[in-house]
Amino acid sequence: MSALNKKSFLTWLKEGGIYVVLLVLLAIIIFQDPTFLSLLNLSNILTQSSVRIIIALGVAGLIVTQGTDLSAGRQVGLAAVVAATLLQSMENANKVFPEMATMPIALVILIVCAIGAVIGLVNGIIIAYLNVTPFITTLGTMIIVYGINSLYYDFVGASPISGFDSGFSTFAQGFVAMGSFRLSYITFYALIAVAFVWVLWNKTRFGKNIFAIGGNPEAAKVSGVNVALNLLMIYALSGVFYAFGGLLEAGRIGSATNNLGFMYELDAIAACVVGGVSFSGGVGTVFGVVTGVIIFTVINYGLTYIGVNPYWQYIIKGGIIIFAVALDSLKYARKK
């Protein structure tokens, strides 16, 4: 192989290698069971993707700034459990707080999003003002949030929280039927989140600032960007996205436990990297995040659909994450 051809191959591998791997996996799934492409399955994939898109949008903003968040999944779980306890039906014999009326959905959204914002602010303060790395900071808050959630879960009975108010069930499980295809309400909420983040990233000074910080924090600081404040804001915003995603996930599934959200952060990070959001910072698009989530959800759903052992699924997903990050590192090695 000539030097030129070798260089072209390496360039192609860096740019599209991960998509080839994912397409091969998808082809294997379809070959094993062609019914995978049914409208019902596509509807389910889109619904599952919608919640993951909301969560991944929160993580993506952090990766753009050369950060990450290992606590995302546990924040999703905390929001799910809190929302579930506040949105149970009054007719539910196992209602956690039997004397308390079911709260309006909008109020519960505000409550869980406020909790998420506070956790995000704590992460942001530690990272921006105490200069602790995002990995260590969010690893610590992941453990703390899970502990808080488990204590609350034990306090309210330590059993799956279900029996939601009909209004909340409709809010999270409702859909628009188009023949055999069902477009869920959750997909509409995800589209709103996507539009919001697209405007934030592309049309606001804040968006320009976070990309500048990700590209070169020192240069951003010299140019007048308040790096610490912007990091604080992006981490708080990420907490809001996790919280809203957790509320929707509880409603979509129909119940919540303290283990809901386990490993969600890894799926979100993997989807972001597959979608072109670079750990080098300063690179990423909303469309890429959405694409990455959908691809990863198709693979997850497909492997389960054809009966692949869950333990093998962990191995496959872990390999995809390592491969995607390795390609990302190669792609931006010269830039670094």
Curated annotation (Swiss-Prot):
<keyword id="KW-0472">Membrane</keyword>
<dbReference type="GO" id="GO:0005886">
    <property type="term" value="C:plasma membrane"/>
</dbReference>
<protein>
    <recommendedName>
        <fullName>Galactose/methyl galactoside import permease protein MglC</fullName>
    </recommendedName>
</protein>
<dbReference type="InterPro" id="IPR001851">
    <property type="entry name" value="ABC_transp_permease"/>
</dbReference>
<keyword id="KW-0813">Transport</keyword>
<feature type="transmembrane region" description="Helical">
    <location>
        <begin position="107"/>
        <end position="127"/>
    </location>
</feature>
<feature type="transmembrane region" description="Helical">
    <location>
        <begin position="279"/>
        <end position="299"/>
    </location>
</feature>
<feature type="transmembrane region" description="Helical">
    <location>
        <begin position="306"/>
        <end position="326"/>
    </location>
</feature>
<feature type="transmembrane region" description="Helical">
    <location>
        <begin position="257"/>
        <end position="277"/>
    </location>
</feature>
<keyword id="KW-1003">Cell membrane</keyword>
<dbReference type="Pfam" id="PF02653">
    <property type="entry name" value="BPD_transp_2"/>
</dbReference>
<comment type="function">
    <text>Part of the ABC transporter complex MglABC involved in galactose/methyl galactoside import. Probably responsible for the translocation of the substrate across the membrane.</text>
</comment>
<dbReference type="GO" id="GO:0022857">
    <property type="term" value="F:transmembrane transporter activity"/>
</dbReference>
<feature type="transmembrane region" description="Helical">
    <location>
        <begin position="227"/>
        <end position="247"/>
    </location>
</feature>
<feature type="transmembrane region" description="Helical">
    <location>
        <begin position="181"/>
        <end position="201"/>
    </location>
</feature>
<keyword id="KW-0762">Sugar transport</keyword>
<comment type="subunit">
    <text>The complex is composed of one ATP-binding protein (MglA), two transmembrane proteins (MglC) and a solute-binding protein (MglB).</text>
</comment>
<keyword id="KW-0997">Cell inner membrane</keyword>
<feature type="transmembrane region" description="Helical">
    <location>
        <begin position="53"/>
        <end position="73"/>
    </location>
</feature>
<feature type="transmembrane region" description="Helical">
    <location>
        <begin position="128"/>
        <end position="148"/>
    </location>
</feature>
<keyword id="KW-0812">Transmembrane</keyword>
<keyword id="KW-1133">Transmembrane helix</keyword>
<comment type="similarity">
    <text>Belongs to the binding-protein-dependent transport system permease family. AraH/RbsC subfamily.</text>
</comment>
<feature type="transmembrane region" description="Helical">
    <location>
        <begin position="17"/>
        <end position="37"/>
    </location>
</feature>
